[in-house]
Amino acid sequence: MNLFTTITNANFDKEMIVARIRETLDTKENLLKQCPDTSVLPAAALWNGEEHTFAVKAALVGVLSTKDEDIRSLREMITYGLKGLSAYSKHANALLKENTELDAFLQRALAATLDDSLRLEDYVNLTLETGKYGVEGMALLDAANTGAYGHPEMTRVNIGVGKRPGILVSGHDLRDLEMLLIQTQGTGVDVYTHSEMLPAHYYPAFKKYPNFVGKIGRASCRERV
C-alpha cells in the first residue's frame, strides 16, 4: 500500500504520508518481536524514529545516496515499476483477485534495491523482470475488472453538465465507483467521472445506473485548480 501511496500525482497530504510512515514503523516493530535473530537483517529493516527525524533520514538514504549513476537509475526505474505493480494489485485485490507470485516479487525486488552487492547486470535483469511482472499485474487487473463489470464496449459519453447536484470520481478504483453509484440511487445526486475514470463508462455493468450521467473536465495536465 505504501508504494501505491507514493505514485506520481496521487497524494500531496503530508499528514497522511507521515501517518503511513508511523503505522509502517509500528507494524515493523511488532514483526521484529517475532523474529528470533534480528542480526541478519539489513539496517533498513531495523531503523525506527520519530517524525522530526524523518527528513534527516530521508537525506541519508534517499535516491542520491546511491553514488553510481547507472545503478541509481536502474534502482529508480525498478521502484517506479513496483509502484505501478502495487497499484494494479491493490485495485485487483479490491475485487477479490490476487496473485501471490506478484506479491512475492514485490518484496524481493524492493529488498534488491538496497542490496549493494548486486552489480549493474543484476539490476538490468531485475528491471526486465519488473516489466514482466508489470504485464502480469495488468492482466490480473483486467481479469478482475472484466470479471466484475463485463468487457468494455464502444460507448458515447456525455460531457455536459446537468442541473442536479453531482459527485466527481477520479482515479481507477471501479469498486469505489460502484459503491458510490449504489449509495446515490434515488437521492437526486448524479455521478460524473473525472480524468482517469473515463473508461468506467465503457463497462456494461455501470450502464444500468441512471444517475451515472457523464464526464466532466479535461486531461488533468490541462486543468487549473
Question: What annotation goes with each model-predicted range?
Answer:
Residues 1-224:
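Metallocofactor- and cofactor-centric catalytic cores in central/energy metabolism, strongly enriched
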